[in-house]
Structures are given as C-alpha cells and as structure tokens.
Amino acid sequence: MAYQNFKLAIYCPAGFLKNAELAMLEKDLEFFKKHLDISKVYLETHRGADTVPREKMLKIKEFFEEKNIKTSGGITATVVFGNEELDYYRIFNTFCYTNQKHLEKLKEIVQHTASLFDEIILDDFFFTACTCPSCIRAKGNLSWSKFRLNLMTEVSREYVIKPAKSVNPDAKIIIKYPNWIESYQETGYNPQTQAEIFDYTYTGTETRDPAHTQQHLPRYASYSLLRWFENIKPGKNLGGWFDALDCIYNIGSYLEQANLTVFAKAKEITLFAFPYLRNSVFVPALGLQLQQLDEICKHIENPAGIPVYHPFNSHGEDHIYDYLGMTGIPFELTPHFQNSSTVFVTADSAHDTDILNKLKNHLLAGKDVVMTSGFLKAMQGKGIEDLTSVRVTDKKVLTNFFAIKTEVCSFSKYVYGKKEVLMPILEHRTNASWQEIVAISGENNFPVLMKDSFGKGTIYTLTVPENYSDFYNLPAEVLTEIRKVFMKNFDFYIEAGEKIAIFVYTNNTFIIESFLPYRTRVNLHIKDKNKKLIDPLKACELKISMISETENIYEINLEPASYRVLKLEN
C-alpha cells in the first residue's frame, strides 16, 4: 500500500503523548494502518503547559521506530508558566519574545527536543502579536510589522537554530507556516529571511469551512499557498499539513484539502492530529483518496499556472487570487515577478516599489498583464496613468446586469447574474481604453474588464467586487470571458459557472475539480482542433461533443467534490 509519490506523516501533540499508554497507541495505530500508509510521526515535546518527559518520549519514540515508522520532533511555541501573573494578553499563549524568561524557556525546549530528534518541526504558533510594555519599548518608532519581522528573524537564528545545532549539529529544523499569508508581516512571520535560516519550510494547507470560521479562506488556498512556498526556494518546502477541524459538516471538504495538497506537488502530507483522527470517519475516506491521488501523480509533472505576483510581506486584496482560482483560472502564486506570457498583479503586488518598471518592460516585450482594480487604486498617482486611462473612483454600483463585447456601438451579449453585486465604479476615457465587459445599472454602464495597449503588450483591468466571493455570483458568460483573457496563451479554457478549478501541468495534463455541492457539466473548449483529449487514468480518448469553427468542445460531467484528469495529445 506504500505511496509512490509522496510520504504521509501524522502529528502527535504533547498533551496527548504526555498521557498516552503504549497499549493505547498500539490499538490506535492498528486503526490507522488499516487505511493509511504512515511513514513518519512528528512527536511533539512541548505545547502550552505540557512538556513530555524525556524518558516517556524515548519509550514512545522506540515504539514507533519498532513499527518501521520514522520519528521526528515537534514544538509548538506556546507557553504557560504556572506561577506567572501577566497584566497583558498573549493570543494562544504564544511567547513574548522580548521577555528573557520566555526566551530562555524557548531555548530550553529547543535543546531538549534536539537531543531527542534529528528532525524538528515548529508548528505554526511561532509568531508574536504581543503588545506588552516590554514589546512597546523595544518597538520604539518602528511599525509593529517591521519590528516583529526583525525580532522573529533574530529569535529564529539565536534561540532556535543555534541552540538546536549546539546540541545536535545534524538536526534539521523545519518551520511550518500558517495559512494566513496576508498577515505574516503583522505577526513576525518572515519567509524572506527564515527560508535562509531554517533548513526547510512546511506549508499549512488547512482551509476547512470558508464561510463560518475565523480564517474565512477560499479552498483554493490549499493549493496556492504551497506553490508560493515552493517558489521561494524550489525543493526546500517539505510538504503540506491539514486537519479535520470544522470539516465534519462535509467530509468532501476534508478530502479537498488532500486533493489540493497533492495537486500542488507536496512531497509529504502531515495530518493533524493523531488523537483527533483515531477512530474518525475521515480516515477510511482519506485512505481511499490518497491511493487514488498517488495514481494521479504518475500522470502530472510540474504546475504551470499563470503567475500571480505576491511579494514578501505584502497584503492588499487578501486571497483575491484564491477566489478567482475557484472560478476556473489556473494560477501559480510566487514571491518573484515572472516574465511569462501573462502575469497577474493585485493590490498585494503594489508593495514592490519597482513594480511599474517591471510591468512596462513586460509589456514592451509584447507580453500581457492583468491587473485588479485594487492594484490600479494603489498605483494611482504613482505612474500607472502611463498604462491606462482607467481610474478607480470612490463611487459604487449595485447590479446583476452585464454586457459582453462591443459590436459597433452596442454590445453583443447581455446577461443577468444570480444576485446583485456591489462593485467599485471605474471611469475611463472612451476609445483611449476599450470595454470588454461592463456592468449595467439604469441608463449607465461601468467597466468590469478593460483593455489597453502599451508598446507591443496588452494590459487588462479587472474590476473586483467589494465582496470578493461575489465573483461566484457573476454570470457564467462573464466568468468565461474573463477566463479567456487569462488563458489567452493556453490551448484550452472552460465554459462554466463558479466553483470550478483548473490545475495545469507542464506535460499538457490538467485537472478540473468541482467545489460545488451538486452535479454539474463543464464545456471544455480546445483551441487546436488537431489535438486529442485523453483520459490518462482510463487510457482512452474522449469523444467530441460539439464543433465550432475554430474549436472542439467536450462536455465534462463532474459530481460534487470530484475531479477529472485530462491530457492533450497531438
């Protein structure tokens, strides 16, 4: 049953291990082994008020190693001192990194763990939001983000890496990052520096319930964030980590996290956590899913989506690429500007002070740019006026009526969405910039997708709804036109509504996944009529459903929370 294309690990928290009996572990492990091929366990030495005694940990370590399961250490950087009275609040009891007592405790925990394990992962609580008097004094005139980025870089080096290596020079230290990339800089997570300090990184791919939980993450984030970390230092991100929290409403949502983690080419998957998954309904379903995903990995190579430029320490339009990723546009999130045929820039990208020069050179080379209204707004008054006559105003429009493409003066198609959408009003100079899609309200219309030329290149401006999830409420015809712009240089695009995602790979293979709760049909348009559409899992060619003047069209049926692997061949 061993997986050929990824490894599987389970994380075991300190509070559980501290009280675990070997007989109980034996029984629980038998349940897991019925369904999963576990190659590693992360054994946590410390979390909060719990630290596993050395002798107890050695016995647990020996237990798993006798089962041919590799053991690595884990640390959660939260702490509770029994006699400590604080007059300030620390979220999740994270350490105060200007408090010397806390720093010495962290050093002690790290050295204890390094004496036991050659590999250690830090769970994603290695951050600070502390605003105690000591931190306020240390911050001085710096912003909180600048202060915390500097602080956690120093703590990483001086209180994690150096102490660990002093005890065990062979120890490899992994930092696991949470799924809230937009907030890293505000809490001291600094991948730009920490990727050089730590031996490896690890990605949190938990998305759970996007609407009813604290983090409200689009499910596509399970894919995009892992790709961003892979693009920091290719090969240095060890894997993706997800859990079953808030997933009981829909087992499919749990399995989607597994799908996207594997689609993003994770080398290892970590399940959180042993005590929560033992005897869980999630485990048998996941076991079957991982076997199927392992087979899929034989047919996909490297991800090849449209680059989305998300610089280090940036925010602006949080997860906008994930919302759009849920509408059938394949993305590749990266901290580095890419000179590909098309690049997507958002308000996040505006944090690069040289972004305008990069865009101009990109366009002069005959390539395309798609920018959001948020990026346009952030760059107004900073030179973006050289590229377009479109401007963001402070006015809004509420409508569900849209028009597509211009024929002479009127539009070629008029369509209604499912509900009214609130959008910022953009203005432009007629015939200086061109309308591709507009929103109509009363006797007026407003840009949704605009087109400009600069040198040999083309720049598109996409209006972003005030509520990003309202992209899901745009008419299917509007979403299809937006896809066609993004996928101008691809051999295919889909005609469909919302909550359909596409993942593209370098070997002409792609995956279409449905996030809908009901069965749906997608029309897949192949631009090159000489190409055949293959199902590599079944080793068969699909039949053409419809033929247009320039395209072959295939009807692809998708069940809820399902996907299809397809390949184009000559």
Describe the role of every protein-language-model region.
Residues 1-2, 33, 58-72, 157-171, ...:
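Surface-exposed amphipathic alpha-helices with a cationic face
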Residues 5-27, 55-66, 70-116, 129-132, ...:
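Active-site-adjacent "subsite" loops/lids of carbohydrate-active enzymes
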Residues 11, 44, 84, 90, ...:
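Hydrophobic targeting/anchoring helices
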Residues 17-35, 100-113, 183-194, 222, ...:
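Short, acidic/polar
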Residues 22-30, 321-340, 347-350:
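A short, well-structured beta->alpha microelement
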Residues 35-47, 93, 102-146:
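Active-site groove signature of glycoside hydrolases
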Residues 44-57, 214:
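Glycine-rich, proline-tolerant flexible connector loops at the mouths of alpha/beta enzymes
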Residues 331, 335, 347-569:
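A conserved amphipathic helix/loop scaffold
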